[in-house]
Amino acid sequence: DEVTISDKKNNFETNYLDDVELNAIYSGKKSELILTENRSGTSFNNARQMYNQTTSLNIYQTDDAGLQLNIGGRGLDPRRSSNFNVRQNNYEISADPLGYPETYYSPPFECLESIQLIRGAGSLQYGTQFGGLVNFNIKKPTRNHSLEAVIRNTLGSNNFYSNFTSLSGTLKKFGYYTFFNYKKGDGFRSNSDFKSYNFYSFLNYDLSKKINFSF
């Protein structure tokens, strides 16, 4: 009998987008797919750890809670990701994508299924920001249980406290996913205290194997 033992030093949790996904074509484009399962630094939305396996990104943090995402690529200024087209579930989340494309909101890392990153000329089809595209994909309802609950509490320095609570499940043809995220802290500088409340809800109904309604 032959016995094979294998192991790996680190989990490499960055992949590439498929050539064709749903109604989008990514063939020939510089793309990356960041898998969020079992990533470190998720409780603080720590961008340095979230993107630590993604090359050529310039990242800095202006707060210690991950309230805003500051990433840049190709030598561009990372301030509030103004040179990236930032989306959530393929929808713009910038305040004014054309006139003032700065991102004031970043979804909590615990709720993400994956992060799509497209750079180069291929990203221009999504907007005028030539740094690239960042798309946050929120988790979908779990298919294995009628009710799945996740509760996560985190304490940190500077009186930091974070609570993430999510509910997910599928009942016959009806699926749901919702979460609430609360953060508070004093910050590492004077006059930088904060409170953050995030709520998200997704409902899905399968009309058939190929047709479903969601909102």
Where in the sequence are the language-model features?
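Short acidic/polar hinge/loop motifs at secondary-structure boundaries
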Residues: 91-119
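Outer-membrane beta-barrel pore domains and translocons
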Residues: 8, 120, 137, 152-158, ...
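Transmembrane beta-barrel wall of Gram-negative outer-membrane proteins
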Residues: 157-184, 189-215
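Hydrophobic, lipid-facing positions within transmembrane beta-strands of outer-membrane proteins
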Residues: 69, 130-132, 147-149, 161-165, ...
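Extracytoplasmic beta-strand/coil segments of soluble accessory domains associated
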Residues: 32-33, 43-95
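Non-catalytic regulatory/gating segments with a bias toward low-complexity or hydrophobic composition
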Residues: 51, 114-117, 134-136
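N-terminal periplasmic "start-of-domain" segments of outer-membrane beta-barrel proteins
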Residues: 4-42, 67-70
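Short, glycine-/polar-rich solvent-exposed loops and beta-turns at beta-strand/coil boundaries
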Residues: 39, 58-69, 127-130, 192-195
